[in-house]
Amino acid sequence: MQVTETTSEGLKREFQVLLPANELEDRLNTELSNIKGKVQIKGFRPGKVPVAHLRKVYGKSVMADVLQNAVNEANQQIVSDKGLRLALEPQIEFPKDEEQTIIERALDAKGDLAFKVKLEVLPSFELADLSDVSIKKLVLKPSDEEVNETLERMAKDSRSFEPREEGAEAQSGDRVTIDFVGRIDGTEFEGGKGEDVDLELGSNTFIPGFEDQLVGAKVGDARLVKVAFPADYQAEQLAGKDAEFDVTVKAVAAPGETKIDDELAKRFGMDDLEKLKEAVSKAVGADYEAQSRRKLKKELLDALDGKYAFDLPPSLVHQEFAAVWAQVEQDLKNRGKTFEDEGTTEEASQAEYRKIAERRVRLGLVLAQVGETADIKVSDDEVNQALFARIRQFPGQEKQVYDFYRNNPQALAELRAPLFEEKVVDHVLGQVQVVEEPVSKEALFAEDDEADAVTGAAATDEKPSESSNEAAADKAAG
């Protein structure tokens, strides 16, 4: 096998590979000899089939394996001999307009096998000194007021409702049980029908104006509710349209008294109110800590990004941009918006998000090298914990989810990647100065200028929610 490097420009490499016909012939004969004792052909005793006859029967299929193995061997030899770190799998190219002829002649052992191997390699760079980097960690502890607000919400959400006396009118805060059928321009639409639906008036669960028109209704009343779907409604086909709902009221119930006491705590599995307060405070604090971590990580990645400037593999940038851009287009579609609605153009947005893709690739390479240099590993136990956490998100489908990940190495790698990234981030945090800064809740949850979906090297962080206490209530209840 003859391998000649023909191109070495930046991160691109090209090699010309030639396997002479006589070498292919030798490889073919070797393979045929290897299968001689394994095949059974009528008229011949096992192991006594002449190689010439084997060649006549199996020659072309065996040669196909020989050619594939030769291509793989060439790739491995190039990478090993040159000490290359590949960005993506090698690309194999045959001379234009001659590919079929070359392959057919090689299959018949009548010609050389010649092809190009095109590679893209990872850049080499030195890890930067971070001793001069100082970043802020925003700190916020749950206040008694926030804990009490969460308890009040939990008490309200868990309160009981008692039927109002016969003929009583529904008031704001009451729960009504209704059947409804919605129509636009006289035609029913998908998702516009419901039976025995419980609705708390004033909760703003339904579209604006719907609940207000049921205040004063009695059991047995039939009402025509007229509303307009918001212009930014998530179902694009309904956004901005007028609709009418035929509503039948089947029950009216008044809310019971909300008490924050030991009985409330017991409803949430706690021994007493103090234990519930501790659980709520811990859950709210965990939510604040998660948001603080998200911002700390972004500031750290910003600092890292400013420390490095090296060539990026174009193919990796292209892949990353394609993934980011698909998210952008899907988001616009879901919201029924255009680039013009957002005050920009498609071209300007593409330029902006290409820079974001480049940042993500650059930071991904930096974090990978930091992890490799520091010998950071993710154990199988840690991956299993992440897998079981994911499985718990799909009650009733546990076995299907488990089998999916165990039979899909790529999916399992996607569970491992954020674990590795967080370990690397922790390692880097140990190399910089972290200064704690007490802040308000508003400051902690203030949005950054850069889109949240693309702040990190791997974009694994979720967008934070202002309703952190609601999430904390769920955690405390769980």
From Swiss-Prot:
Residues 154-173, 444-478 are annotated as: Disordered. Coiled coil: none annotated. It is an enzyme of class 5 (isomerase). It comes from the Bacteria. Its EC number is 5.2.1.8. GO terms for biological process: 'de novo' cotranslational protein folding; cell division; chaperone-mediated protein folding; protein transport; protein unfolding. It is found in: Cytoplasm. Residues 154-167 have a biased composition (Basic and acidic residues). Belongs to the FKBP-type PPIase family. Tig subfamily. HAMAP family: Trigger_factor_Tig. Involved in protein export. Acts as a chaperone by maintaining the newly synthesized protein in an open conformation. Functions as a peptidyl-prolyl cis-trans isomerase. PANTHER family: TRIGGER FACTOR CHAPERONE AND PEPTIDYL-PROLYL CIS/TRANS ISOMERASE, TRIGGER FACTOR-LIKE PROTEIN TIG, CHLOROPLASTIC. This is Trigger factor. It comes from Methylorubrum populi (strain ATCC BAA-705 / NCIMB 13946 / BJ001) (Methylobacterium populi). The lineage of its organism: Bacteria, Pseudomonadati, Pseudomonadota, Alphaproteobacteria, Hyphomicrobiales. The gene is tig.
